[in-house]
Amino acid sequence: MDSRTVGILGGGQLGRMIVEAANRLNIKTLILDAPNSPAKQITNASDHVDGSFANKEDIEALAAKCDVMTVEIEHVDVNALKEVQKQFPKLEIYPTPETIGLIQDKYVQKQHLVKNRIPVVPSITVENSKESLIKTGSSLGYPFVLKSRTLAYDGRGNFVVKSEEDIEKGLEFLANRPLYAEKWASFKKELSVMIIRSLDGRVYSYPIVETIHKNNVCHLCYVPARVPDSVQHKAKLMAENAIKSFPGCGIFGVEMFLLDDDSIVLNEIAPRPHNSGHYTINACVVSQFEAHLRAILDLPMPKNFTSLSTNSTNAIMLNLLGDPETKDKELQICERALNTPGASVYLYGKESKPNRKVGHINIVCSSMKECDKRLQFIMGLKTDPIKHSVMEILNAEEVRKPLVGVIMGSDSDLPVMSAACKMLEQFEVPFEVTIVSAHRTPYRMNKYASEAVSRGIKVIIAGAGGAAHLPGMVAAMTPVPVIGVPVKGSTLDGVDSLHSIVQMPRGVPVATVAINNSTNAGILAVRMLGIHNYDYVKKMEEFLNKQEEEVLQKAAKLESIGYEKYLESK
């Protein structure tokens, strides 16, 4: 796929999963880290470098063997990277040393974001002294968060100062570190998103994720985030704008807070694959790890490559941490996961230690409710008396993926559009039905239309009244055939809807049926599906034969008893 060698600073689980993605694409990777680190365990290259990614000589040794260098952790020696880049002028380093330097010092990162007008929680620099923190408490109020500027992750660099009495504990907890203080953010949800930045500066977003933390460590990720579309859109724009402000390319994890007043502030950025993006391995078209490789090697990034696999894809990621009391207890969770349809287990080749990340489990289903149900079983929250019924549910046949999307601008259109649904049910066509307003939810409409192909939708039936822009706008954004249903409104008897849908410009066709006749839309959709599935052709032939038989029976009856008795019998 690419003849260049990628050198990775760091051989932990993130490096391991980058290597897994690289192996599928025949991309050679070399690792700088300790012997037998997780990433080195799965590649038999003889020229890995044993050493530290914070040591200049070791970085030089790796640089001499690779064409492109990247990181799986930002805690590297940036000055060494800059010197190595001068020493090896053909070597490409992504993210750039400049970007890593801006991000690895979290206070510098915050100042950079403020400069680029990205909303963040207010923060100030502090000295490592009780007097300085007393002043900070007066300035920011209690509680506030004391944070290490560098070498901090998984909550290990944070200390919540609830009152003046906590100051000395905080200084002891974060001793000998450069510090800053952050105002307490009263948030109701933590959100995260993976953003890809290409070599030419374009950015691509993965779905917004809701993260649940336990003891300051990511415990669960829910995808898509359980927040309104408007919140997801705001979070996506904020994250994209933040990443646009940094030079270079690669994947970035962006963490955000959804505050009590529904505003969003950016918490922090990681210039690498991120724990909250592990779900992408099973739930998305391209995983975060492959996307990172595509970015740093300037490989193709096709349309919708960061999308969920289907419109009905839901996922939960569960982190596996070493149990503080029972060694290898997490393996019991893995055992239950192996018995669970839609669950995938990823172990990192690390010795189990208390609260150490040793793996994760991805659960992918067609609904969040089903994901939650399976999560409960995997975590052992379901008791034995109902275990059998739970397993029956888990092993139930998956709902077939929809082939037809039935959409409408308002629930007031549902009585009309339900006829199309009934027709699809009659022909045993799997379909989905939802509300997508061209005027009130334009971003949702755009997402629905642009992702239709990747989700396996073959035909879209769109009903709309009045201005009736929905069918035409959807047809403009997807190669999937669109059938328009003019819905009769309170004025103009639906003629306005008919004209809006049928009068499409050349190049953007909409197959338009009669006013309020979604029955025909359903039948037409089945005929379209019959082009690729002969089962639907046979069912359509049976349907037509049945119609003919009904008409012939009526004709025979009319001819036999005469029109007057026929009318009386109806």
From Swiss-Prot:
Biological process (GO), any one: purine nucleobase metabolic process
Gene3D superfamilies: 3.40.50.1970, 3.40.50.20, ATP-grasp fold, A domain (3.30.1490.20), ATP-grasp fold, B domain (3.30.470.20)
Catalytic reaction equation(s): 5-amino-1-(5-phospho-D-ribosyl)imidazole-4-carboxylate + H(+) = 5-amino-1-(5-phospho-beta-D-ribosyl)imidazole + CO2
Pfam families: AIRC, ATP-grasp, PurK_C, RS_preATP-grasp-like
UniProt gene name: ADE2
Known EC number: 4.1.1.21
The protein, known as: Phosphoribosylaminoimidazole carboxylase
Pathway named in the protein's UniProt entry: Purine metabolism; IMP biosynthesis via de novo pathway; 5-amino-1-(5-phospho-D-ribosyl)imidazole-4-carboxylate from 5-amino-1-(5-phospho-D-ribosyl)imidazole (carboxylase route): step 1/1
Domain ATP-grasp as annotated: residue spans: 110-297
Keywords: ATP-binding, Decarboxylase, Lyase, Nucleotide-binding, Purine biosynthesis
Positions with a binding annotation for ATP: 137-192
Family the entry assigns: In the C-terminal section; belongs to the AIR carboxylase family. Class I subfamily.
Bilayer-crossing regions: none
Organism: Candida glabrata (strain ATCC 2001 / BCRC 20586 / JCM 3761 / NBRC 0622 / NRRL Y-65 / CBS 138) (Yeast)
GO molecular function, one term: metal ion binding
SMART domains recorded: AIRC (SM01001)
Transmembrane listed as a keyword: no
EC main group: lyase
